[in-house]
Amino acid sequence: MKRLAIFCLFFFVQPTFAIGCINMKDNWIECLAQILKSEGGYVDDPRDNGGATNFGVTKKTYENWVGREVTKEDIKNLTIEDVAPIYKDRYWARVRADELVDGADLLLFDLSVHSGPRRSVKIAQETAGTVVDGLIGPKTVAAINAMDQTEFIKKFSENRLAFYKRIEAWKHFENGFRNRVKKTQIAAQQMVK
């Protein structure tokens, strides 16, 4: 995983972005590389509510980011340099991943990307036994960080899978959901120090 992170940093991301990452939590790039590995490239599956997507960024998300309508061709042409700031602002920062212990940061970040920051926080709150309101504050961060991380990772992954089983897309994407949860769980556990 570290090789993939380094590869993404030095071969896909422009030097100015890489320099901006120096002050971030050490494993931001490793977490981003894991997300990009899971998200893949351009897809436009009619069964997926996200529609045209590239590197996991939907057309709607990108339109909100740039403040204008975009075409599917614009989405096809996205680069890692285009999407990395979106990931940092819209998903990483909104779950306060910089404040979370290693492993938990990846779990919340990944689910934030896949199902939205609020859903990610709710599942984390359910897992940590705090008030479930979808708003991550100091109490939620402290509760997550205080848990045994192997236990947190296991329970969070179980709760995430239970959430997926309740949504309509489960019948079409069950295998993909299961694989993503398992791969993210393994990667998160490997980050625990």
Language-model segments: residues:
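Sec-dependent N-terminal signal peptides
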Residues: 4-13
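Cell-wall polysaccharide-cleaving catalytic domain and substrate-binding groove, primarily
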Residues: 17-193
